[in-house]
């Protein structure tokens, strides 16, 4: 499980990105890179890192399910992810 402070920091970054998205888009269209550089660093979408919604793990993230491979495997074995079943051929 990831530290709660890291998960909270990532959530704060996500909120900042959403808050400044319109302003960033307008400044980029104008080409005003001076004003763009004065916005908070964490408002840049490139600073976001995907984290597992269950454990907060930053690595081995599966975008489709928004969780890490470890959490995915556990929940899939329990049958708690709709439409997912173990493959057999």
UniProtKB/Swiss-Prot annotation:
Upregulation: Repressed by the zinc-specific metallo-regulatory protein zur.
GO-annotated cellular components: cytoplasm; small ribosomal subunit
One Pfam family in the UniProt entry: Ribosomal_S14
One GO MF term: structural constituent of ribosome
Keyword Ribosomal protein: yes
Disulfide bond as UniProt keyword: no
Family: Belongs to the universal ribosomal protein uS14 family.
NCBIfam families registered for this protein in UniProt: PRK08881.1 (NF006477)
Subunit structure: Contacts proteins S3 and S10. Part of the 30S ribosomal subunit.
Protein name from the UniProt record: Small ribosomal subunit protein uS14A
Lineage start: Bacteria, Bacillati, Bacillota, Bacilli, Bacillales
Gene name of the encoded protein: rpsN2
């Amino acid at each position: 499980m990831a530290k709660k402070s890291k998960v909270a920091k990532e959530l704060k970054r996500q909120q900042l990105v959403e808050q400044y998205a319109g302003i960033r888009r307008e400044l980029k269209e104008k080409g005003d890179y001076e004003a763009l550089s004065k916005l908070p660093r964490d408002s840049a979408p490139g600073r976001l890192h995907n984290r597992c919604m269950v454990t907060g793990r930053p690595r081995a993230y599966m975008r489709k399910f928004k969780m890490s491979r470890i959490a995915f495997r556990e929940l899939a074995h329990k049958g708690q992810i709709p439409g997912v079943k173990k493959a057999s051929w």
